[in-house]
A protein has these predicted regions:
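Active-site-proximal alpha-helix that buttresses catalytic centers in soluble enzyme cores
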Residues: 1-150
Length: 150
């Protein structure tokens, strides 16, 4: 079970009179068709796992909904706390500079809502497993192609 799943499982177990918490997964955004599908699939997974919880996607730029729109959606669904999780591997300027600005703006717009910036994806042993899997996929393809040559 992932760290986010554990956090959401905890949220799932809290009494209904507790603070209503939303999770907003934030990706970069792209003009390329289907470029945002991975993030949307992750959000869809968690929406199905916890259908009574608020789980939404938003994008830093280009793609809708924007981060302010995502915060608005969460508040519109009754969120009293919003945990913003950056769907970014690296702690570059978007994570260090841009996202905190959006968090500050969200807090200013909704002073009674607790808007929290969570950690970006960063390094995790499962990332190593995924990279290893991708390397082996390519190597297996090369072996298949080499064996297919006359």
């Amino acid at each position: 079970m992932s760290s986010l799943e554990k956090q959401l499982e905890f949220l799932d177990e809290t009494p209904q009179d507790q603070v209503k918490t939303a999770v907003l997964l934030v990706g970069h955004g792209s003009r390329a068709r289907n470029a945002n599908d991975a993030l949307l699939r992750v959000v869809d997974h968690f929406q199905k796992a916890w259908p009574h919880r608020i789980l939404r996607a938003a994008f830093l730029e280009i793609s809708p909904p924007s981060i302010p729109e995502g915060i608005d959606l969460c508040v519109g669904e009754g969120a009293e706390r919003i945990i913003v999780i950056p769907y970014f591997l690296f702690r570059g300027n978007h994570v260090k500079v841009d996202l905190p600005v959006f968090i500050k703006e969200g807090r200013k717009k909704y002073p009674d809502i607790d808007v929290i910036l969570g950690p970006h994806l960063g390094f995790h042993p499962k990332i190593i497993e995924i990279v290893d899997e991708r390397i082996h996929q390519v190597l297996d393809t090369l072996k298949t192609e080499e064996n297919a040559l006359p």
